[in-house]
């Protein structure tokens, strides 16, 4: 039975800066564009709710990402729509293996309301995110062979974005990589659950808020890169503060120009996270929930060594944190850390040596010498046959 007032915030209501007027009041059973029937809620985020739908024209399941109403300058919603339209044009021009691992829009339309339009992005339904997958493994450590499979394919996706589309994702993380569904069985299960036990929304000032249905966890090893709200063209030059805190490339940290190499960096940091179940960098003041720039710099130096003098001399932060010779002069002190010690899930020996060579091609201060997707895809550690020992 619907309630007139929720005792506790539910799903999107619990997000910071939530305003009910910004979310479209979706109801199960709604038919959008005279074509897409809403079956059940799959998830939510700061800029959208996501629903399982049925496409009456193609007779297939569809994922319906119904975005908040946001027409402000720099809106991630408008940016994602523009980027998806651009990706679709490139996808039609030429085939590329990266298309298999990139979530493209099948349809984009807007729903008109008295307060303004809401975009709806239609895509092929996918499984849970890698972040959700981490939660089912002990200590959030994924099997090494699964990590190799995921990371290799992500580099193929990124190669298409960079080389063909001229676009930088900028927000690659386990949350923004979904697992491909091998078939529709889990979607049929959700529809059956909804039929037998219909979702009842909590009503808040006339706005329905539904609980999400869980999607199937797949171990196919096929990742689908998604969420393009923070995507940027490589031109004109980017040099503003960007990227997620735990995956931020050093050139962004140093307020230098940045481009395609930031995505390579993010995948490298993510590789370590999936193998070890923890983040390489944690420059967050947990008491105040704030990112601490000097703490980040100190941690980067701890794992990567001091940045090249010719790099940091270009940074506006140079004399704030370093002396004229490039020595660290700030607090906190440089932590005693090494990649060798951080990596514990690969035993010492030839394979660990190969992995450290792989990761050091990626985690570099200088983006100019950081491996590109083309250079890293054939790497020995990444491509070593699964049944062949080092």
Language-model-detected regions and their locations in the chain:
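Intrinsically disordered, low-complexity regulatory segments of kinases
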Residues: 1-390
């Amino acid at each position: 039975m619907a309630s007139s007032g929720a005792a506790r915030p539910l799903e999107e209501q619990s997000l910071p800066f939530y305003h009910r007027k910004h979310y479209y009041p979706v109801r199960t059973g709604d038919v959008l564009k005279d074509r897409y029937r809403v079956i059940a809620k799959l998830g939510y985020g700061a800029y959208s709710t996501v629903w399982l739908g049925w496409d009456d024209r193609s007779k297939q399941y569809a994922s319906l990402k119904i975005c908040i109403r946001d027409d402000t300058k720099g809106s991630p919603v408008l940016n994602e729509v523009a980027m998806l339209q651009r990706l679709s044009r490139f996808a039609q021009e030429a085939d590329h293996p990266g298309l298999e691992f990139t979530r493209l829009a099948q349809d984009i339309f807007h729903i008109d309301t008295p307060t303004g339009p809401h975009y709806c992005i239609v895509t092929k339904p996918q499984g849970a995110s890698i972040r959700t997958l981490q939660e089912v493994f002990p200590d959030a450590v994924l099997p090494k062979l699964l990590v190799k499979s995921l990371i290799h394919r992500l580099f193929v996706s990124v190669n298409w974005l960079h080389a063909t589309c001229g676009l930088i994702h900028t927000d690659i993380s386990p949350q923004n990589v979904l697992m491909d569904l091998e078939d529709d069985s889990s979607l049929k299960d959700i529809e059956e659950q909804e039929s037998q036990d219909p979702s009842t929304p909590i009503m808040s000032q006339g706005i329905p808020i539904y609980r999400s249905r869980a999607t199937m966890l797949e171990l196919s090893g096929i990742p689908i890169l998604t969420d393009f709200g923070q995507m940027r063209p490589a031109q004109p030059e980017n040099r503003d503060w960007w990227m997620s805190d735990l995956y931020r490339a050093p050139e962004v940290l140093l307020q230098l120009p940045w481009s395609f190499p930031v995505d390579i960096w993010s995948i490298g940091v993510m590789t370590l996270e999936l193998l070890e179940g923890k983040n390489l960098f944690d420059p967050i003041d947990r008491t105040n929930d704030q990112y601490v720039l000097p703490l980040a710099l100190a941690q980067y130096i701890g794992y990567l060594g001091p940045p090249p003098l010719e790099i940091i001399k270009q940074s506006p932060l140079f004399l704030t944190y370093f002396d004229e010779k490039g020595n660290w002069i700030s607090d906190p002190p440089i932590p005693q850390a090494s990649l060798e010690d951080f990596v514990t899930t690969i035993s010492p020996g030839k394979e660990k040596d190969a992995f450290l060579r792989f990761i050091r091609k990626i985690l570099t201060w200088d983006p100019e010498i950081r491996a590109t997707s083309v250079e890293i895809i054939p790497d020995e550690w990444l491509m070593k046959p699964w049944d062949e020992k080092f």
